Amino acid sequence: MTKTLTIRRPDDWHLHLRDGAMLRAVLPETTAHFARAIIMPNLVPPVVTFAQAQDYHARILAALPEGAEFTPLMTLYLTEDTDPDDVAAAHANGLVHAVKLYPAGATTNSASGVANFDNIRAVLERMAEIGLPLCVHGEVTDDDIDIFDREAVFIDRVLDPIRQATPGLRVVMEHITTRNAVDYATAQDDTLGATITTHHLVINRNHILAGGIKPHYYCLPVAKREEHRLALRAAATSGDARFFLGTDSAPHTDANKLLPCGCAGCFTATNTMSILAHVFEEEQALERLEGFASLHGPAFYRLPANEARLTLTKTPATFPSHIETEDGPVTVFDPGFVPNWTVV
């Protein structure tokens, strides 16, 4: 029986750090285990321009714990007014590694997102030319589309037409939640990748709604039926390089979660690696954890894999129920079981 597991230090290809007091509180939870992360730009106001990305990058570096070795990989928030030349300059500088597409109104702080996709055609064409990936929150926001169907409809109505109209555009389907997304991704070439979160490997929609509503399991895209969770687990543990870790760790204070209209997001930075090792062991795929967490993402983003290592031991993991911030506590994601693996 395996007692220890050593892998290349993992990266998080979808992370929310927020800003200010929240940034200072949650950043150490990520730097404890991860070497790099794709940083989401949905602040208020959003990180739209190269200059704004430079400023946010500086704030992240200033908040790093002493001795931390961590590289924030910045993104720009795509709007219908985004300047293709600004995007190209940000990419050429090496600071910005992706542009993020939020359909207007799809998730937290997405009001500035895209409503008319024809208005971003020039930006997407420039991105295809320079090889800059587009990270996509893949949900339509039409009121007449059921929330559990919005990812599947987005693939047909928006994503596939964008890819057909922009040959060579490199796209990351972020935080996929459906068998539809898994099937679409596995049928594509290497210009398409897909991130899978920790929590979507663990929970289905029953965990949110059955036996009383569980606000701390509410996220967007919302967790789906069990058949979709199982499809995600199969994809994540398959060894297919199209699939890689993006936690979508999304901290909100409890005061902002426990409301009549509470915020969406699960905070998983603290215990992701322990949970993933547990899940991969359940799927008899521990040897593929390194690929999912440490190798597939860098390969897609054309970056070297980390040389540093992370070691886990086969001992039950303990972690706090909350972390404290200046604005109040943030609940750490509870997988509903004690993970069998602990990060050394």
UniProtKB/Swiss-Prot annotation:
PROSITE patterns in the cross-refs: DIHYDROOROTASE_1, DIHYDROOROTASE_2
Keyword NAD: no
Keyword line: Hydrolase, Metal-binding, Pyrimidine biosynthesis, Zinc
Domain of life the protein comes from: Bacteria
Residues bound to Zn(2+) 2: 100, 137, 175
Similarity comment: family membership: Belongs to the metallo-dependent hydrolases superfamily. DHOase family. Class II DHOase subfamily.
Protein name per its UniProtKB record: Dihydroorotase
Taxonomic path: Bacteria, Pseudomonadati, Pseudomonadota, Alphaproteobacteria, Rhodobacterales
